Amino acid sequence: MRLVEIGALSADSDLVLWEASCETISHQISLKLARKEGGLMEIFNSVVASLPRKSDSFRFSAISSKTSWESAHRNLLENLTKTVPVLLENGWKKSPDFQKNSLIDLFSLLEDEDATRIFKMTQESRSITEDDVEDYFSMFDKKFDRLLTYGAPQFENCVRDSPMRQKYANLCVEVLVAVGASVKNAQKITDFLEKQSMKVSKIWMTRIPEIFEKITNFYDYPMMFDVAMALDGFPLRKVFLARRFALQSILEVFIEMAPNTKYKVRERVRQELEKASRFVGYASEMGHDNLLSSFSPKIVSSIEDSKHILEVETIERLRRCGYLENLGAPLDELVRAQIASIREILPHFSAEFVHLALRHFSYDSEVTLASLLSRENLPLELLRLENVELRAGIGSGEWPPLDFTASDEIEKLARADKRAKDEETRKNNETKSASNLFSLAPILSDRPPSPPVDQQAELRAHAEAYRTSVLTKLQKIRADAAGPSSPSEKIAVDAENLVPLATSKKYSALNSLKISEADKVAIRPTYNKYRYETPNDGGNGVYDDEYDDEFDGREFNIERLNQELETSSEEDEAGSSAPPGLSQPPPYQGSRGGRGGRGARGGNRGGAPSADGYTGGHDRQMKEKHKSDIKQRGADRKKRGVY
């Protein structure tokens, strides 16, 4: 029997089912240990793989919210620990269900005291060797590649009205939580094995900057809104918390493990840090400049470039969300007075920065002033723009702004509606069921419940308006991404009209080749006019043989009217008296080496003009008409049996 798994965004009903599963498996383990039955290895592998760790703050915080759930988790872990000595005594590797990675993975579940006791048992029985540990971390390194191939790619390719969209949205959150929890588990196992004097490879941590960059690319700002909109109740805060949990976990693990790296691992870490990236910028903003610079002096320039990248991206996001509109010069007199009063106390802050801080704290001047003084409650993006010259711009408003208060209210209403529907379903089932003489159903009051006092009507209205606004803007983002933008579309930036350039070679080339039917009809006469060369074209100056590559170097002689033409001998004499230094090209000598007498047929094709006075080129229409006659004659001969 496998343990029921709970999701990162699990509901109370899921946790109740998980609690029952924990109690059932704990009872099974106790019975098998008492009766000395088999099947413990299968239970051990499934429980170790799915039991939540403390590193998974999403699942473990949900379990810790209720005493019974926490007790079920603790009892199952204790019974699981009791199975290890029995499995080792009976021959761990002799079992057909043996998985050595499960035994190593167990150390991420246990406390140090229990983990040390079990590790000594494994060393006595030689159940874990250094080769097993190396294989475990090699598989863990590959886990990153598999992990990032799920979630975001499937969600982006899913049709909006598809029933699988909510499933893929849940998968995106699961991937983010799994990345953060897996990195923390790997750090815990590495530290524990090093304390036990076992050699452990840390090569897996050199990929942390790459993973950090991929997460920020896949799960960007609009993607988070889209995922939250596809989930029940619009849990925007939890979706952003999952992304922050993943990024913060891998950053903390890297900062804690990087100083102790050596040799090959340290060299690869240095190469990753010398590249300008969001990871280097975030690590510098968290105050780890000295640690980064200890790997190489070149990282100092990488830190500056990374910070500049983050500043540009932050300003662009604020502009798209509309936060830069009328920045520093608000239309409201009260807001202007708030900015002036704060700048009297803190004159080193610009009016634009103070206005941006007021917008973040919902125009609460006291909270804004206290946050600017202490700097502890300021968000990272505001600290990033503290020394940047901000300018008011036209806010496009194409991205929805963050409003966790409204999203929390939407989620609360969705949960209340779900509870009401479940209660109504339960009552309907009780009514339809046959009434027995003795019923074990709880006695419900016949008195109708008193109507609730709605004291948050304004907050609910704001939340619903926010949800509608987010949905509208996400639909516009999808529409812009689905269809290529018109090349005539212009964007107003700093009072200038800029035409967006096509960044994709494929689509820009396709757009340049698009011709309407009206244009095709208009250019068809011109195309047909120059399609064939005919004797009546009047093109006497055109060379008469297009297949001849001989160059005629003779000069054109312009004769006067009513004057006899020179003879051919005179022309030859005039040609021989060419100025020195200009050599005449040799006459054409046949084609490709020639085959006997057939070389004469391939000689100089420039002949005398025809007797009928026609001096133009070949009749292209006749050639096109009869060009396949030779093939038809050959086919007739083959049919008659000549060949």
Curated annotation (Swiss-Prot):
<feature type="region of interest" description="Disordered">
    <location>
        <begin position="561"/>
        <end position="643"/>
    </location>
</feature>
<dbReference type="GO" id="GO:0006355">
    <property type="term" value="P:regulation of DNA-templated transcription"/>
</dbReference>
<feature type="compositionally biased region" description="Basic and acidic residues">
    <location>
        <begin position="617"/>
        <end position="635"/>
    </location>
</feature>
<dbReference type="GO" id="GO:0043130">
    <property type="term" value="F:ubiquitin binding"/>
</dbReference>
<dbReference type="InterPro" id="IPR052586">
    <property type="entry name" value="ASCC2"/>
</dbReference>
<dbReference type="InterPro" id="IPR041800">
    <property type="entry name" value="ASCC2_CUE"/>
</dbReference>
<feature type="compositionally biased region" description="Gly residues">
    <location>
        <begin position="591"/>
        <end position="606"/>
    </location>
</feature>
<dbReference type="InterPro" id="IPR009060">
    <property type="entry name" value="UBA-like_sf"/>
</dbReference>
<protein>
    <recommendedName>
        <fullName>Uncharacterized protein C06E1.9</fullName>
    </recommendedName>
</protein>
